[in-house]
Amino acid sequence: ADTSGSMYWCSASPKPISVAFSLAIYFAERNSGDFKNHFITFSCNPQLVEIKGKDIYEKVKYCETFAECANTDIQAVFDLVLSTAVKNKTLPEDMPSKLYIISDMEFDYCAENSDVTNFEYAKEKFEQNGYALPKVVFWNVASRNMQSPVEMNEQGVTLVSGCNPRIFSMVTEDKCTPYEYMLDVLNQERYADIKA
């Protein structure tokens, strides 16, 4: 979950930071292995956080204690996932199959004057350590700029923007292609009377 300052600046409802923590808790509870009940905060010093609390209220309050209003270093997040796997000798098949980057997409660059994206850089580092970079869902919960963390047609990446139950269902059911989204919208009851 992006805990950088820009996640608090938006006047939208719900606030991007609230969405980020909610989704982080949801996905963390469904993780397995070394990442079970963990999520990563990210700004300049990302942390792998084990979620604590008896109920959703306690879990959210606990997660809020890790909010750091600083810059957003997405590369440090990829490095933390990789170093955790290496440290725990996680088998490749026990790695998370998908990473959800819940953010407003205002990331720092991974390297100055670099010709590679943060994603390409991470993919190479994972491969150097015997792992495949998990599929990545960049979920923009507060679009203010036209920033994109990957180039068009990048394999293994899904870009999602917005915050509503339909988008949540599509992401969790793994129906995130533009074509599937279009069909989902067009097949709604409100368009049933339209004939071609």
Feature map (PLM): residue ranges:
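Acidic, glycine-rich A-domain
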Residues: 1-196
